[in-house]
Amino acid sequence: MSTQALSLHTGLSPLSPLGVLDRVGWWGALGMIAVALVYTLFMLLASRGAPRRSGPSHPDAPLLIVILMPCLNEAEVIGASVRRLTSIPDPGLRIMVIDDGSDDDTAQVAAQAGDERVEVVRRRPPRARLGKGEALNDALSIVRSRSTSVPSSRVIVGVMDADGRLDPHAISEARRAFAPQEVGAVQMGVRINNRFGSLLARMQDMEFVIFTEVFQRGRRRVRSVGMGGNAQFVRLSALDALGPRPWTRSLTEDFDLGIRLNATGWTNEFWSASAVHQQGVTSMRRLMRQRTRWFQGNLQALHLLRAVAREQRGLGRADTLWQILTPYLLLTGSLLTLSFLITMVTAAVAAVLRWEQSWAWLVGAYVIAFGPALVYAWIYWRIERGNGLGPLKAVGYSHLFVLYGLLPSVYGWRAVARELTGRTGWAKTAREAEPAQATESARSVSATVPPATHPAT
């Protein structure tokens, strides 16, 4: 709808103060949409190219890979996750399960792995339940004390969620990813296990696939890859560059870590050759709670702007600044969504009253809103067609994905309210137990923790 048409329906004169404000808002909205579309197009094109490589590779000295798995009441899922890791025949792999003061049998279930590569660390009050970052920092202190005979550049610290299932070849792929000396961190892809039985889980899977296939792959080109909380691998020497306790108390300590690593001169790499599989949230209420926490954590990253502007260069700096400012852009975008809904209502009223108007704007709005989604549909279909997804169904999912993408308009403002009122404490999101895991967790476990369990100090 043109600004003249809007003025006709609202009774505003184009030369009145409100009319001028209306036009400024209209063109401002178009400008924001144009910037978002150009950014998406740039990342889409960048993601199709090969990553930049410049540094020499390490010699064939072995890497020690230590997987840290922070857990709080994860008895339902931790057993299967540990078994999946111990099934990988890699003598240079170690698994450290961090029981962060659980009330259930998390430690006992993990300790039943029966593999000498598995260690259970128990955190007790008052050191327990201080956040994922604090749990990781305490575990890292143990890793450092145990690996003094190995150069820190040859020690890789991985982070996995308790419900994570790494691809069988993921550890060997991690070794390949860290061959270049400049690589300080590697993030693998994320897939949602239960996407076949839940539409909400399907949207989360599509979200992760689009994010990794377009934006993470594109960021390989500009050296601004972000880190996630699952299947994150970091060189110990890169963590050392961030100090003795590299993970912060941010609600999104993974995002925070990735930003700060990019500012140290190390290269963050995205590795698409393998992925971690996790359970998606199937309850809208729990999803909104989870995403509110993530959004609030991203809001807390604003203090990193100065370091990024000072330490990074070129397109990498520009994109990292974009990542930090994204939640604020989404909040502004939510106002555009509200404005569009008001415009739709105005147009509907005009149609009922038989006012003359052009509907060409509606076609343009559809192209702007759903055009990128059709590209996403093709990308997602290409990834999922081996699992029986047809192209028409992918297009249908892409339209639902646009509506799913409106959720930040709701939970974003909730996150702002929590941040402004100083509410930063969160209970973890309940896991979605798989049937096989639920059966196993019901089995009797020993009441005492085997000797393999190590208390954190």
Can you say where each PLM-predicted feature lies in the sequence?
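Cell-envelope/extracellular polymer assembly enzymes that use nucleotide-activated donors
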Residues: 63-66, 94, 256
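Long helical/loop segments within the catalytic core of UDP-sugar-dependent glycosyltransferases
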Residues: 124-125, 129-148, 152-154, 168-250, ...
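Membrane-embedded multi-pass helical conduit in multi-pass membrane proteins
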Residues: 57-59, 326-420
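A conserved acidic beta->alpha catalytic loop
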Residues: 99-108, 123-128, 165
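The conserved acidic donor/metal-binding loop of glycosyltransferases
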Residues: 161-165, 261
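Short, acidic, metal-binding catalytic loop of nucleotide-sugar glycosyltransferases
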Residues: 83-92
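N-terminal membrane-anchoring/stem segments of glycan-assembly enzymes
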Residues: 1-61, 376-379, 408-419, 447-456
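Catalytic donor-sugar/metal-binding loop of nucleotide-sugar-dependent glycosyltransferases
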Residues: 258-276
